[in-house]
Protein backbone atom coordinates (compact mmCIF):
# COMPACT_ATOMS: atom_id res chain seq x y z
CA UNK A 1 0.00 0.00 0.00
CA UNK A 2 2.72 2.45 0.97
CA UNK A 3 4.74 1.45 -2.07
CA UNK A 4 1.79 2.18 -4.36
CA UNK A 5 1.41 5.66 -2.81
CA UNK A 6 5.13 6.32 -3.21
CA UNK A 7 5.09 5.28 -6.86
CA UNK A 8 2.02 7.43 -7.54
CA UNK A 9 3.73 10.42 -5.93
CA UNK A 10 6.82 9.79 -8.04
CA UNK A 11 4.67 9.69 -11.19
CA UNK A 12 3.33 13.13 -10.32
CA UNK A 13 6.84 14.43 -9.66
CA UNK A 14 8.11 13.03 -12.97
CA UNK A 15 5.18 14.60 -14.83
CA UNK A 16 6.14 17.99 -13.39
CA UNK A 17 9.76 17.47 -14.41
CA UNK A 18 8.63 16.90 -17.99
CA UNK A 19 6.54 20.04 -18.17
CA UNK A 20 7.98 22.61 -20.59
CA UNK A 21 8.30 25.71 -18.48
CA UNK A 22 10.26 27.91 -20.89
CA UNK A 23 9.67 27.64 -24.63
CA UNK A 24 11.37 29.24 -27.62
CA UNK A 25 8.33 28.47 -29.77
CA UNK A 26 6.21 30.66 -27.50
CA UNK A 27 8.27 33.66 -28.64
CA UNK A 28 7.25 33.21 -32.28
CA UNK A 29 4.28 35.47 -32.88
CA UNK A 30 2.78 36.63 -36.15
CA UNK A 31 4.30 39.93 -37.19
CA UNK A 32 7.08 39.75 -34.61
CA UNK A 33 10.71 38.88 -35.32
CA UNK A 34 12.29 36.89 -32.49
CA UNK A 35 15.84 37.84 -31.50
CA UNK A 36 18.12 35.08 -30.23
CA UNK A 37 21.17 36.92 -28.88
CA UNK A 38 24.33 34.86 -28.67
CA UNK A 39 27.05 34.78 -26.04
CA UNK A 40 30.36 33.64 -27.53
CA UNK A 41 33.98 34.56 -27.01
CA UNK A 42 35.56 33.29 -30.22
CA UNK A 43 35.06 31.35 -33.43
CA UNK A 44 37.35 29.41 -35.79
CA UNK A 45 36.72 31.89 -38.60
CA UNK A 46 37.13 35.13 -36.61
CA UNK A 47 39.38 34.19 -33.69
CA UNK A 48 38.72 36.19 -30.52
CA UNK A 49 35.51 38.17 -30.94
CA UNK A 50 35.16 39.58 -27.43
CA UNK A 51 38.42 40.63 -25.77
CA UNK A 52 36.71 41.58 -22.51
CA UNK A 53 34.50 38.51 -22.31
CA UNK A 54 32.02 38.77 -19.44
CA UNK A 55 29.09 36.37 -19.95
CA UNK A 56 27.01 37.67 -17.04
CA UNK A 57 27.32 41.30 -18.14
CA UNK A 58 26.49 40.27 -21.71
CA UNK A 59 23.37 38.46 -20.52
CA UNK A 60 22.24 41.46 -18.48
CA UNK A 61 22.67 43.76 -21.47
CA UNK A 62 20.82 41.38 -23.77
CA UNK A 63 17.91 41.26 -21.34
CA UNK A 64 17.93 45.04 -21.05
CA UNK A 65 17.97 45.36 -24.83
CA UNK A 66 14.93 43.13 -25.22
CA UNK A 67 16.36 39.84 -26.48
CA UNK A 68 13.72 37.11 -26.73
CA UNK A 69 16.11 34.20 -26.17
CA UNK A 70 19.78 33.57 -25.42
CA UNK A 71 22.23 31.32 -27.27
CA UNK A 72 25.32 30.14 -25.39
CA UNK A 73 28.33 28.53 -27.08
CA UNK A 74 29.53 25.62 -24.95
CA UNK A 75 32.23 24.21 -27.25
CA UNK A 76 35.58 24.72 -25.51
CA UNK A 77 38.30 23.90 -28.03
CA UNK A 78 37.13 25.88 -31.06
CA UNK A 79 34.83 28.57 -29.64
CA UNK A 80 36.36 28.98 -26.17
CA UNK A 81 32.97 28.39 -24.61
CA UNK A 82 32.08 26.32 -21.57
CA UNK A 83 29.19 24.32 -20.18
CA UNK A 84 29.83 26.18 -16.92
CA UNK A 85 28.73 29.43 -18.56
CA UNK A 86 25.32 27.97 -19.34
CA UNK A 87 24.98 26.43 -15.91
CA UNK A 88 25.91 29.68 -14.16
CA UNK A 89 23.66 31.90 -16.29
CA UNK A 90 20.57 29.68 -16.16
CA UNK A 91 19.31 30.99 -12.78
CA UNK A 92 19.77 34.59 -13.91
CA UNK A 93 17.09 34.66 -16.62
CA UNK A 94 13.69 33.25 -17.50
CA UNK A 95 14.39 33.60 -21.21
CA UNK A 96 14.78 30.43 -23.29
CA UNK A 97 18.41 29.32 -23.51
CA UNK A 98 19.79 27.57 -26.59
CA UNK A 99 22.79 25.35 -26.03
CA UNK A 100 24.95 25.95 -29.11
CA UNK A 101 27.31 23.04 -29.63
CA UNK A 102 28.06 20.14 -31.96
CA UNK A 103 25.74 17.42 -30.70
CA UNK A 104 26.64 13.96 -31.98
CA UNK A 105 25.51 11.67 -29.16
CA UNK A 106 22.36 11.34 -27.00
CA UNK A 107 24.38 11.87 -23.82
CA UNK A 108 24.90 15.50 -24.86
CA UNK A 109 21.13 15.97 -25.04
CA UNK A 110 20.66 14.75 -21.49
CA UNK A 111 23.60 16.88 -20.42
CA UNK A 112 21.90 19.92 -21.99
CA UNK A 113 18.83 19.36 -19.83
CA UNK A 114 21.01 19.03 -16.73
CA UNK A 115 22.81 22.28 -17.57
CA UNK A 116 19.50 24.13 -17.82
CA UNK A 117 19.11 24.55 -21.57
CA UNK A 118 15.62 24.76 -23.06
CA UNK A 119 16.70 24.31 -26.67
CA UNK A 120 19.48 22.39 -28.39
CA UNK A 121 21.04 22.76 -31.82
CA UNK A 122 21.12 19.79 -34.19
CA UNK A 123 23.38 20.38 -37.19
CA UNK A 124 22.15 18.42 -40.20
CA UNK A 125 25.55 18.37 -41.90
CA UNK A 126 27.10 16.23 -39.14
CA UNK A 127 24.13 13.92 -38.51
CA UNK A 128 22.34 11.24 -40.48
CA UNK A 129 18.60 11.48 -41.05
CA UNK A 130 18.14 8.61 -38.60
CA UNK A 131 20.19 10.42 -35.95
CA UNK A 132 18.21 13.62 -36.44
CA UNK A 133 14.92 11.75 -35.98
CA UNK A 134 16.24 9.92 -32.93
CA UNK A 135 17.66 13.05 -31.32
CA UNK A 136 14.41 14.94 -31.93
CA UNK A 137 12.48 12.16 -30.20
CA UNK A 138 14.82 12.12 -27.20
CA UNK A 139 14.63 15.91 -26.93
CA UNK A 140 10.84 15.92 -27.02
CA UNK A 141 10.62 13.10 -24.48
CA UNK A 142 12.64 15.07 -21.91
CA UNK A 143 11.04 18.46 -22.63
CA UNK A 144 13.70 20.11 -24.79
CA UNK A 145 13.03 21.93 -28.04
CA UNK A 146 15.46 21.63 -30.94
CA UNK A 147 16.60 23.83 -33.79
CA UNK A 148 17.63 21.71 -36.75
CA UNK A 149 20.21 23.66 -38.73
CA UNK A 150 20.67 23.37 -42.50
CA UNK A 151 22.80 25.21 -45.03
CA UNK A 152 22.06 23.66 -48.42
CA UNK A 153 19.61 21.63 -50.49
CA UNK A 154 21.00 18.25 -49.42
CA UNK A 155 20.71 19.08 -45.73
CA UNK A 156 17.22 20.52 -46.19
CA UNK A 157 16.08 17.33 -47.92
CA UNK A 158 17.47 15.33 -45.01
CA UNK A 159 15.16 16.98 -42.46
CA UNK A 160 11.93 17.30 -44.46
CA UNK A 161 10.33 14.07 -43.28
CA UNK A 162 11.46 14.32 -39.66
CA UNK A 163 9.62 15.83 -36.70
CA UNK A 164 11.54 19.09 -37.09
CA UNK A 165 9.52 22.10 -35.91
CA UNK A 166 12.17 24.83 -35.77
CA UNK A 167 14.41 25.11 -38.81
CA UNK A 168 17.61 27.11 -38.59
CA UNK A 169 19.05 28.29 -41.90
CA UNK A 170 22.76 28.95 -41.53
CA UNK A 171 24.02 31.59 -43.94
CA UNK A 172 27.56 30.42 -43.25
CA UNK A 173 28.95 27.28 -44.87
CA UNK A 174 30.61 25.41 -42.00
CA UNK A 175 32.95 23.59 -44.39
CA UNK A 176 34.78 26.74 -45.51
CA UNK A 177 33.09 29.51 -43.43
CA UNK A 178 31.96 31.43 -46.53
CA UNK A 179 28.92 33.61 -45.91
CA UNK A 180 25.84 34.73 -47.85
CA UNK A 181 22.65 36.13 -46.35
CA UNK A 182 20.95 35.20 -49.61
CA UNK A 183 21.10 31.58 -48.46
CA UNK A 184 18.03 32.08 -46.28
CA UNK A 185 15.97 33.28 -49.25
CA UNK A 186 17.27 30.46 -51.44
CA UNK A 187 16.21 27.70 -49.04
CA UNK A 188 12.89 29.38 -48.28
CA UNK A 189 12.17 29.35 -52.01
CA UNK A 190 12.89 25.62 -52.06
CA UNK A 191 10.46 25.07 -49.19
CA UNK A 192 7.83 27.15 -51.00
CA UNK A 193 8.17 25.06 -54.16
CA UNK A 194 7.75 21.89 -52.10
CA UNK A 195 4.68 23.32 -50.36
CA UNK A 196 6.43 23.03 -47.00
CA UNK A 197 7.11 26.68 -46.14
CA UNK A 198 4.50 26.73 -43.38
CA UNK A 199 5.65 23.44 -41.86
CA UNK A 200 8.41 25.10 -39.84
CA UNK A 201 9.32 28.06 -37.71
CA UNK A 202 12.36 29.48 -39.52
CA UNK A 203 15.37 31.16 -37.95
CA UNK A 204 18.07 32.86 -40.02
CA UNK A 205 21.56 32.45 -38.58
CA UNK A 206 24.95 34.13 -39.19
CA UNK A 207 26.04 37.27 -41.02
CA UNK A 208 23.32 39.54 -39.65
CA UNK A 209 24.96 42.87 -38.83
CA UNK A 210 22.93 45.84 -40.08
CA UNK A 211 19.33 47.04 -39.96
CA UNK A 212 19.18 46.51 -43.72
CA UNK A 213 19.87 42.81 -43.04
CA UNK A 214 16.99 42.71 -40.56
CA UNK A 215 14.68 44.51 -43.00
CA UNK A 216 15.60 42.01 -45.72
CA UNK A 217 14.88 39.03 -43.45
CA UNK A 218 11.59 40.58 -42.32
CA UNK A 219 10.60 40.77 -45.98
CA UNK A 220 11.18 37.01 -46.20
CA UNK A 221 8.86 36.52 -43.20
CA UNK A 222 11.30 34.48 -41.15
CA UNK A 223 10.26 33.92 -37.54
CA UNK A 224 13.54 34.73 -35.88
CA UNK A 225 17.20 35.65 -36.22
CA UNK A 226 20.26 34.51 -34.31
CA UNK A 227 22.88 37.23 -33.89
CA UNK A 228 26.23 36.72 -32.20
CA UNK A 229 29.30 38.48 -33.56
CA UNK A 230 27.58 41.80 -34.33
CA UNK A 231 26.43 42.06 -30.70
CA UNK A 232 29.54 40.62 -29.05
CA UNK A 233 31.75 43.21 -30.76
CA UNK A 234 29.72 46.13 -29.41
CA UNK A 235 30.67 47.91 -26.20
CA UNK A 236 26.96 48.57 -25.73
CA UNK A 237 24.90 45.80 -27.34
CA UNK A 238 21.73 47.44 -26.01
CA UNK A 239 22.19 50.30 -28.47
CA UNK A 240 22.96 47.87 -31.27
CA UNK A 241 19.79 45.90 -30.56
CA UNK A 242 17.83 49.16 -30.63
CA UNK A 243 19.40 50.01 -33.97
CA UNK A 244 18.49 46.64 -35.46
CA UNK A 245 15.08 46.41 -33.76
CA UNK A 246 13.61 49.93 -33.34
CA UNK A 247 10.51 48.40 -31.71
CA UNK A 248 12.66 47.23 -28.81
CA UNK A 249 13.82 50.73 -27.89
CA UNK A 250 10.74 51.12 -25.71
CA UNK A 251 12.38 48.64 -23.31
CA UNK A 252 14.85 51.36 -22.36
CA UNK A 253 12.26 53.98 -21.47
Swiss-Prot record:
<keyword id="KW-0456">Lyase</keyword>
<dbReference type="Pfam" id="PF00218">
    <property type="entry name" value="IGPS"/>
</dbReference>
<dbReference type="InterPro" id="IPR001468">
    <property type="entry name" value="Indole-3-GlycerolPSynthase_CS"/>
</dbReference>
<dbReference type="GO" id="GO:0004640">
    <property type="term" value="F:phosphoribosylanthranilate isomerase activity"/>
</dbReference>
<dbReference type="InterPro" id="IPR045186">
    <property type="entry name" value="Indole-3-glycerol_P_synth"/>
</dbReference>
<dbReference type="InterPro" id="IPR013785">
    <property type="entry name" value="Aldolase_TIM"/>
</dbReference>
<keyword id="KW-0057">Aromatic amino acid biosynthesis</keyword>
<dbReference type="GO" id="GO:0004425">
    <property type="term" value="F:indole-3-glycerol-phosphate synthase activity"/>
</dbReference>
<comment type="similarity">
    <text>Belongs to the TrpC family.</text>
</comment>
<keyword id="KW-0028">Amino-acid biosynthesis</keyword>
<keyword id="KW-0822">Tryptophan biosynthesis</keyword>
<keyword id="KW-0210">Decarboxylase</keyword>
<dbReference type="InterPro" id="IPR011060">
    <property type="entry name" value="RibuloseP-bd_barrel"/>
</dbReference>
<protein>
    <recommendedName>
        <fullName>Indole-3-glycerol phosphate synthase</fullName>
        <ecNumber>4.1.1.48</ecNumber>
    </recommendedName>
</protein>
<dbReference type="GO" id="GO:0000162">
    <property type="term" value="P:L-tryptophan biosynthetic process"/>
</dbReference>
<comment type="pathway">
    <text>Amino-acid biosynthesis; L-tryptophan biosynthesis; L-tryptophan from chorismate: step 4/5.</text>
</comment>
<dbReference type="InterPro" id="IPR013798">
    <property type="entry name" value="Indole-3-glycerol_P_synth_dom"/>
</dbReference>
Amino acid sequence: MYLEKIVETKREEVAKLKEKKISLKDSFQKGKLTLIAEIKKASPSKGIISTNFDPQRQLELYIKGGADAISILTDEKYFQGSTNILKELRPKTNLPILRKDFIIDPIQIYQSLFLGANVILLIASILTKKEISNFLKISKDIGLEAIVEVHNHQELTKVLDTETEILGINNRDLSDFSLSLRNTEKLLEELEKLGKRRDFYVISESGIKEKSDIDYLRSLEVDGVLIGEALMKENDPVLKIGELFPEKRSNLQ
